[in-house]
Structures are given as C-alpha cells and as structure tokens.
C-alpha cells in the first residue's frame, strides 16, 4: 500500500534515477577503460612473444582479448559492490539484538505498535532489533543475505531502534518514529534508495583514500561520488517528507512526531561517530534523522534530509488540518 504518490515525488525519482544511472555508467566505463588499457599493454608483450614463435593471430584476436578484459573487470567490479553492501549491512546488524531478547519495559509496546502500524498499511510486520548505543537512532535496512536490488516486495525489512532513542522518547513519540520507518517501507523507499546507492558505492570504490586525487581515475571517482550524492539527496529529501506525512496519518498525532524530531535533534551530536560515518552511505537516507551531521540537512545539493524547520512546518500544517 503506497501512502503517497504525488507528482513531485515521481519527478524527483526520475531525476535521481537519471543522475544515478549516469554515475553508474561512468564508473563502469572507467573500470572498462582501465581493463582495456591493461589488456593493450598485455597484448604488446603477447604480440612480441607470438612473433618470436612465428604465430600470427587473426586480426580480431586482440580486440576480442581487450573486450574480455573489460567484461571480466566490470563483472568483478559489480561483485565487489555487492560484497561491500552486504558487509555494511552485516556490520550494522551484528551489534543489534532481537527485540524479543531485550529486557526493557518498552519491549511489549514497541512490538504491539509495529504490528498495529504495519497492519494499518497492509504490509508484513517488520522485524525490530535493538542497538545498545546511547546515540538516538532509528533506521531501516535489509538482511545481509537479502537481494541487493529486488523486483518484488517479498523481503521483510528490519527496523533498528537504539536504546538511546527509546530512552529519549515518550511512548507516543516512539510510536510516531516507528510509523515514520514503516511509512518508508510502505512507500517502497528502502528498495528504491538501495537502487540509488549502488552507483554511489560504485563511484566511491574507485577512490582508494578519502580526499585522494593521486590519478585521473580517482579524480573521476570523487567527481562521480559528488554527483551520485546529489541524486540520492534529490530523492531522499522528498521521501523523508513523505514518510513524515505517512507517520502523521498512521499515528493520528502529527504533534508526537514533531516533538520526537525536536528531541532527537537536540540530543544528536553535531559530529557523528566514526562507525556511523563509515556506513552512512548505506544507511543515512533511511534514518529518521541524518547521521552525517549538519551537511546532511537542509536544501543543499548533498542534503539527504530536509531541514528540521521544514519538517516541523509540514507537521504543524497537518495538525491544523
């Protein structure tokens, strides 16, 4: 059950897909160029060796070899991207505990709220896990072994709530945050944002060290990463507002989500922890609040979330309605 399909969101999705498609094509092209260049160097030595033994290969022999080099390199590159995504999903989930195994007073309320909200929008109840960190976090992801990009909606996502978030919020605020995450699931945001993050990770894979521009390929990788972040931001800013609206509708309490956002904003450190920064490219766009610090909020090109003021104004307007 999709909760929002306004034209503006469709336009954002098309624009983001175009940007991300360009980035992915560029990344694959760079890998292919490197592979072909290596193949040409190899063919130079190979030609000398074949000439020494007096063997003349067919005219198309070396172009075929170069093509196979490009095909093999791009195939390995894609496999590397898949491995990176699965590793990052696993890294986030390995520090979490199933809700049923956590001894907290709020466990029963969280479980019943997740079931009730999922039933409201006609989706399977998502798995809820608890992260013991005191940093307020609420995000949605897939299992590490789930398909990277799936054409169906059979995969049940996992919602992760941190102990810090649970202790910070009241029950109504916690329910509103759960509704926000379930709104993302109902709107298929997780699957769509994963599609957009693949080109970003592909571009980042071309750069060995953050900030390094030691050769033209790394320079291109940084440029493509910047462009990919623009595409992710264009899409995710609109989806965050849509998830806020969905949460307000499901909970019937826009003020509860507004209060939760204000509390979380006040309790969030301006400098995210290293592990959050390391994995932000796979998780940041589906976190109720950004994990990249101030640069991730607002109207800037790289912002993944709207400003707090924009989100609160939308919720206030829903309250008035």
Please give the residue ranges for each predicted region:
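Loop-to-transmembrane-helix entry motif
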Residues: 17, 21, 181, 185-189, ...
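Residues at alpha-helix boundaries and short interhelical turns
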Residues: 169, 186-189, 234-237, 251, ...
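Active-site-proximal gating segments in proteases and membrane effectors
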Residues: 122-125, 129-151, 249-321
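Hydrophobic or amphipathic, alpha-helical segments that drive membrane association/targeting
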Residues: 1-131, 204-207, 221, 225, ...
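Peri-catalytic and regulatory segments of divalent metal-dependent proteins
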Residues: 80-194
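DG-centered beta-turn motif at the end of beta-strands
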Residues: 180-181, 243, 307
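Short helix/loop segments within enzyme catalytic domains
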Residues: 105-123, 213-284
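Post-HEXXH active-site segment of zinc metalloproteases
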Residues: 189-221, 264-265
């Amino acid at each position: 059950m999709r909760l929002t399909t306004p034209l503006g969101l469709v336009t954002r999705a098309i624009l983001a897909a175009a940007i991300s498609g360009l980035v992915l094509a560029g990344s694959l092209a760079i890998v292919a160029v490197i592979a072909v260049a290596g193949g040409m160097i190899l063919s130079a030595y190979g030609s000398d060796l074949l000439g020494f033994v007096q063997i003349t290969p067919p005219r198309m022999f070396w172009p075929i070899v170069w093509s196979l080099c490009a095909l093999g390199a791009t195939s390995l590159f894609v496999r590397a991207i898949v491995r990176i995504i699965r590793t990052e999903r696993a890294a986030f989930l390995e520090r979490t505990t199933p809700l049923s195994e956590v001894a907290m007073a709020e466990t029963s309320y969280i479980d019943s709220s997740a079931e009730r909200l999922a039933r409201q929008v006609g989706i399977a109840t998502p798995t809820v896990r608890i992260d013991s960190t005191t940093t307020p976090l609420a995000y949605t992801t897939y299992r590490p072994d789930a398909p990277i990009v799936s054409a169906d909606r059979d995969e049940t996502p996992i919602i992760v709530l941190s102990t810090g978030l649970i202790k910070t919020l009241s029950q109504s605020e916690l329910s509103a945050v759960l509704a926000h995450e379930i709104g993302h699931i109902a709107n298929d945001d997780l699957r769509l944002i994963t599609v957009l993050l693949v080109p970003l990770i592909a571009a980042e894979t071309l750069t060995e060290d953050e900030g390094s521009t030691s050769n033209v390929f790394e320079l291109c990788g940084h440029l493509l990463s910047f462009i990919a972040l623009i595409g992710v931001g264009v899409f995710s800013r609109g989806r965050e507002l849509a998830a806020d609206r969905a949460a307000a509708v499901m909970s019937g309490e826009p003020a509860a989500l507004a209060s939760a956002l204000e509390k979380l904003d006040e309790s969030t450190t301006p400098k995210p922890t290293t592990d959050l920064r390391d994995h932000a490219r796979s998780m940041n766009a589906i976190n109720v609040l950004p994990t990249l610090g101030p640069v991730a909020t607002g109207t800037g090109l790289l912002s993944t979330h709207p400003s707090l003021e924009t989100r609160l104004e939308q919720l206030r307007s829903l309250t008035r309605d």
